[in-house]
């Protein structure tokens, strides 16, 4: 009772807190640990060239186990095979637009070890990375990747496909005498062929008794030139929190310093010493296996009885058979060739970025100096009937771009897949004492560079955008341009004031819907 009264007296005697004032508390600096905000999409540089090292997951080790009973004191082998390592896969997707979301080092999960009672280890999870449509893969080191098409032939068991991934048709649970004789050679290039013998029958009988079904998931791998893109694999789940084993740290020792995003975006476009081009991913859903997982080691239940009883093989070859195979490693260079409906082509400072901002909601960097745009910018032009056209702002081209002058190859590769070419010409290049190039000569130089880079590129549907019509004397220059270039749609505009932009939108739509559009021929351009 007295304690309750004492607590009440203390509560009454405590002073009240001071009234809140209008003065707030401000931090001089941001709290520690808070990440800075990411720059908006328009101000971030487009990463269209990327270096990637990939390693498949190692196979799990086979289990060495004996099952003893009253009738069999020595015991029978019942160790299961190790699981196959996961693959590293590139998946083509429309949800990404460059390589900024990729990691320079990718590694799939390791297969689980086999256990007793003839239980096979779980297959390692695949590591899947999404790349934009139009990605070109070049191989520097490692084995050649291959596109894959899934064709399941029967109902699949969850332990066979933990993440709905492919499994090699050469299962690690099958054995043969050829494998036993070639142990001294490289095991990574060998597979285990099935043979009718007692050891194999015991192995497969143990698998069926444990699972009830044949644990095989056949996958057909096809070459790049044979892939028709008609059948795409289903979505595959990926564990983003995959942790690597300590025994795999050797893969990362050679590359301790990873490139920052700023180093990648500011990286110069140099000629890479690549051996050959591997594939081009142009359709959503295509998947490319760039690093394969290693096969799992054999358990003693699937090893020939003669080898198990032989003392000569028991220590050396038995240990090598039960060890899982390492995954393959590859070093790739990814390049992006933008896939857009319309490509804005022109000399530096012709007003291409300003025109893109007038046609769409894209906000590229705009300045009054040459080569403001070093990475292509893509905007979307939407019409009233919800018809959408993708417009790409290609960086400025100069004379000799086809010889890689002024990063020409890095810019020209983005034009290869555009359906329509819009030549943006500067009408005011020679006005008011400017030492520029007349618009008809600009057009001739652009046509020559495109034709030298890829024959037939200028035969695509084309139109001419005569920019900066608001300058004094630009009307006379435009009339002279119409006399020198004929047979091509021409639109005089002022991109910064958006004069003539609505007519240009209609012209682009008509050119997209035209049944027999015409390109630009060099012979139809009259130059002094």
Swiss-Prot record:
Residues 1-45 form a transit peptide. Residues 197-207 have a biased composition (Basic and acidic residues). Residues 340-513 form the OBG-type G domain. Residues 77-86 have a biased composition (Gly residues). Residues 52-87, 167-212 are annotated as: Disordered. Keywords: GTP-binding, Mitochondrion, Nucleotide-binding, Transit peptide. PROSITE patterns: G_OBG, OBG. SUPFAM superfamilies: Obg GTP-binding protein N-terminal domain, P-loop containing nucleoside triphosphate hydrolases. GO terms for molecular function: GTP binding; GTPase activity; magnesium ion binding. GO terms for cellular component: mitochondrion. InterPro entries: G_OBG, GTP-bd, GTP-bd_Obg/CgtA, GTP1_OBG_dom, GTP1_OBG_dom_sf, OBG_GTPase, P-loop_NTPase. It holds the Pfam family GTP1_OBG. Residues 46-339 form the Obg domain. CDD domains: Obg. Gene3D superfamilies: GTP1/OBG domain (2.70.210.12), P-loop containing nucleotide triphosphate hydrolases (3.40.50.300). GTP binds at residues 346-353, 393-397. Belongs to the TRAFAC class OBG-HflX-like GTPase superfamily. OBG GTPase family. This is Probable GTP-binding protein OBGM, mitochondrial.
